[in-house]
Curated annotation (Swiss-Prot):
The chain crosses the membrane at residues 56-76, 88-108, 120-140, 143-163. Belongs to the CDP-archaeol synthase family. Catalyzes the formation of CDP-2,3-bis-(O-geranylgeranyl)-sn-glycerol (CDP-archaeol) from 2,3-bis-(O-geranylgeranyl)-sn-glycerol 1-phosphate (DGGGP) and CTP. This reaction is the third ether-bond-formation step in the biosynthesis of archaeal membrane lipids. One of its GO terms (biological process) is glycerophospholipid biosynthetic process. It is found in: Cell membrane. The keyword ATP-binding does not apply. Keywords: Cell membrane, Lipid biosynthesis, Lipid metabolism, Magnesium, Membrane, Phospholipid biosynthesis, Phospholipid metabolism, Transferase, Transmembrane, Transmembrane helix. This is CDP-archaeol synthase. GO terms for cellular component: plasma membrane. Its EC number is 2.7.7.67. Pfam families: CarS-like.
Length: 181
């Protein structure tokens, strides 16, 4: 049981800098869309939901979360937690990669004819995870190899959809989102 708790704690800890950016982007977005309103094949490339401001603030928030977690790590270590600190490269990779993963998914969502806010099952729940991990691999490969053990990766891919759907439902109830998914 202790091993399961350790794996789950590591999975959540490690992914927090990737979990936060898209939520912050929803709260701080608006302004100029990344695609500048351009279309491809008669459809918006990304849509109004992907903005420079949201991407910038989301990335900064994810990096800030990682740095904040590093600040409290000594306290957690004293009570027995065995968690990995974030290098700046890992923090940037996870945060920016989460935003980039969501942007890439939006591109494919538009190509498939889905409008903004229409569900894209599995992709909606995991795009930011894949983007975050891939960018972290590029910027901090040793950190990723040391941190993302196979059990942690499995936990991330199981927990993330549950957390994603739960936070989206909460954001809907609080009026931050127009749909509960």
């Amino acid at each position: 049981m202790d091993m399961i708790i350790e794996v789950v704690a590591t999975a959540v800890w490690t992914m927090l800098p990737a979990y936060v950016p898209n939520n912050v982007a929803v709260l701080t977005g608006g302004g100029a869309p990344i695609d500048g309103g351009r279309t491809l094949g008669g459809r918006r490339i990304l849509g109004d939901g992907k903005t420079w401001r949201g991407t910038g603030f989301g990335t900064l928030a994810g990096v800030a979360v990682a740095l904040g977690l590093n600040t409290i790590l000594p306290i957690l270590t004293r009570v027995g937690a065995d968690l990995t600190p974030f290098s700046l490269e890992a923090a940037v990779g996870l945060a920016f990669g989460a935003m980039l993963g969501d942007i890439v998914a939006s591109f494919f969502k538009r190509r498939s004819g889905r409008r903004r806010g229409v569900p894209f099952p599995v992709i909606d729940q995991l795009d930011f995870v894949v983007g975050g991990i891939l960018c972290a691999v590029i910027l901090a490969p040793r950190w990723v190899i040391a941190t993302f053990t196979p059990p942690v990766v499995i936990a991330v891919f199981i927990l993330t959809p549950i957390l994603h759907l739960g936070t989206n439902a909460g954001a809907y109830v609080l009026g931050f989102k127009k749909e509960p998914y």
